[in-house]
Amino acid sequence: MAAERGAGQQQSQEMMEVDRRVESEESGDEEGKKHGGGGIVANLSEQSLKDGVDRGAEDPEEEHELAVDMETINLDRDAEDVDLTHYRIGKIEGLEVLKKVKSLCLRQNLIKCIENLEELQSLRELDLYDNQIKKIENLEALTELEVLDISFNMLRNIEGIDKLTQLKKLFLVNNKINKIENISNLHQLQMLELGSNRIRAIENIDTLTNLESLFLGKNKITKLQNLDALTNLTVLSVQSNRLAKIEGLQSLVNLRELYLSNNGIEVIEGLENNNKLTMLDIASNRIKKIENISHLTELQEFWMNDNLLESWSDLDELKGARSLETVYLERNPLQKDPQYRRKVMLALPSVRQIDATYVRF
């Protein structure tokens, strides 16, 4: 989630440009969720496959692809990892022969309904990312399921998963969900990704005491609230919402990464108990002053670009963070100073990257 570090590479150059790798909006690490190509156990004729075009990049109006009949797909009955990504499958059927399957990937197909999975009692991971599903249903029998991804579909409600009590990771990114609900039984949940939906309030998550990562970016949330029970939370992302104040984080004593960029925050506050923070992203807000963070001595990354910072003396607030390596301060008024980079280096000698450029000493 942090900008990639390249210290020691190309040392003959005075400095080198690197891409800022922004924390996911809210997909988390999609590559990490993909099932490896080595697990592909199905074969399909070339005529039935679509050549290398990502369906997510297509015109959304084009939904006229002909669905493939699953009877044309040869399945390995003994496979534990089945990857049927981009097979143009229109209906889930014929999978009951997979008596040993633990991971089933049905990404980027034409599936409209979750069905005919009740025989897959051994299933641990189910990936339905990028289909045309409008309702979560028919999953009650999959009581051993640990990972469920129904991102990039057409869901309006969170439902039909209250029996999945072994679930550890739930991805419902980029749907049309407007309320967090019906997940109170998921006590084992460690990661919840609800980014790019229509959620207006943080609610109904107080029973998720094992939650470690919560992604709520790109929603319509106006207040940080109802987080007190999540004492194991280490990553919280509420970027690109409608927040005006940093609050409600006092119980998150184990929080290490906090992403609040692209909101309407005016003051840095409310972080008194978050001493373990290593990453703080408050970019693209309305903040005029760095304050109330001198106690965050474990900070490694501080992103405050695109704000209203004017005073160089504010950087003194970061001097206690001896491990601080990366700062983003570009597009603040103080960047107009011709000695901008030099002054940042002098104020924060531990820093190895200023904005998108590495520093070489």
Swiss-Prot record:
Keyword Ligase among record annotations: no
GO biological process: chromosome segregation
Subunit comment: Interacts with PPP1CA, PPP1CB and PPP1CC/PPP1G.
Protein family according to the UniProt entry: Belongs to the SDS22 family.
Organism: Mus musculus (Mouse)
Cellular-component GO terms for this entry: chromosome; nucleus
Every LRRCT domain range: 332-361
Region listing for Disordered, in residue ranges: 1-64
Tissues showing expression: Widely expressed with high level in testis. Expression increases during puberty. Expressed in spermatids and probably also in spermatozoa.
Gene: Ppp1r7
GO molecular function: protein phosphatase regulator activity
UniProt keyword annotations, A-Z: Acetylation, Leucine-rich repeat, Nucleus, Phosphoprotein, Repeat
Modified residues (N-acetylalanine): A2
Descriptive protein name: Protein phosphatase 1 regulatory subunit 7
Keyword Repeat: yes
Primary localization: nucleus
